[in-house]
Amino acid sequence: MIEIEKVCVDFTAGRGTSTRAVDDVSLHIAAGEIFGIVGTSGAGKSTLLRTLNALTRPSQGRVNVNGVEISALDGKALRQARQRIGIIFQHFNLMHTRTVAQNVAFSLKAAGWERSKIAPRVAEILTLVGLADKANRFPVQLSGGQKQRVGIARAIANHPDVLLCDEPTSALDLETSATILALLRQINAQLGITIVLITHEMNVIKSICDRVAVMSGGKVVESGEVFDVFAHPQHAFTQQLVSHTLNLTLPERLREHLPGQLLKILFIGDSAEQPVLSEVAIKFGVAVNILHGKIEYIGERALGILVVQLTAPHNPTAVAAAVEHIRQRTAQVEVIRG
């Protein structure tokens, strides 16, 4: 569906100097998936997204969408290719002097739809996004979530194959963000549209995406299935993002002053539902103190992470035996302090 091959994007600054915003990025995005690109501000993710509809041209490399090198198109051919690629923005970009229905109809008129087919299509798409009763409202009369729904309706009205989402929830509160993400998931499942979404929030990635690429300094430092990236982050930057998202950082005071061994334990799938800690407490006579932890469900797979303290003042070897038992029953054990 989308092939990004060794793409670099350079921006010229003053006095002939240039800045590399995207640095040698290669990605394959399959048809029908929801693919996330995550990174902090300045990571290059928005610039990379804009190469997918040629709003930004690569300085090097190629971008192919549906077998067509969109980075090489211009004129009429580019306009036709862009009709198959919808885009929604962080700040909605609605026309404030036009109604909801007129905002959606505008994209169809621009694409050359027959006049008689525009109104039925607008009604159909507003029903899909839950705004059938808001067709004659103006943007100023809408909430932030409703404005983003108009943006989504406008972006998918022309039956695109691809929907680009540029930080679609960053201007919304948590509850509204969840409803927008649920709508995007529904659109993906119902219409089969490939979605490419950029965000700085790993929670958004966890909620909606099938696969993810992590960007830092213009490079993709890690990519893979969302569950695998959360369960086994390889790059230091990804580890930092995941740790922050799961909120598993212990206060330094606890790390320094608690006796015994401190472990971070990863449970995957069925192991997240097994009484492993109860087993070691009974079998080895160690005291188990859970300091921090949670179980997340990514897709339909369980991912549990616990930070625990193990102590056995009168039997030092029991702790080592307990740790070994935990290693055999769980996906991963990290000794934070031993």
Swiss-Prot record:
Gene3D superfamilies referenced in this protein's UniProt entry, alphabetically: 3.30.70.260, P-loop containing nucleotide triphosphate hydrolases (3.40.50.300)
Alphabetical UniProt keywords: Amino-acid transport, ATP-binding, Cell inner membrane, Cell membrane, Membrane, Nucleotide-binding, Translocase, Transport
GO function term, MF aspect, one: ATP binding
Binding-site residues, ATP: G39, T40, S41, G42, A43, G44, K45, S46
Domain ABC transporter: 2-242
Record Pfam families: ABC_tran, NIL
Catalytic activity: L-methionine(out) + ATP + H2O = L-methionine(in) + ADP + phosphate + H(+); D-methionine(out) + ATP + H2O = D-methionine(in) + ADP + phosphate + H(+)
Enzyme class per UniProt: translocase
EC number: 7.4.2.11
Subcellular localization, as worded in the UniProt entry: Cell inner membrane
Record's bilayer topology term: Peripheral membrane protein
Top-rank lineage group of the source organism: Bacteria
SMART domains, per the entry: AAA, NIL
GO cellular component: plasma membrane
Oligomeric form and interacting partners: The complex is composed of two ATP-binding proteins (MetN), two transmembrane proteins (MetI) and a solute-binding protein (MetQ).
Function of the molecule: Part of the ABC transporter complex MetNIQ involved in methionine import. Responsible for energy coupling to the transport system.
Family of this protein: Belongs to the ABC transporter superfamily. Methionine importer (TC 3.A.1.24) family.
Protein name: Methionine import ATP-binding protein MetN 2
Lineage, uppermost ranks: Bacteria, Pseudomonadati, Pseudomonadota, Gammaproteobacteria, Enterobacterales
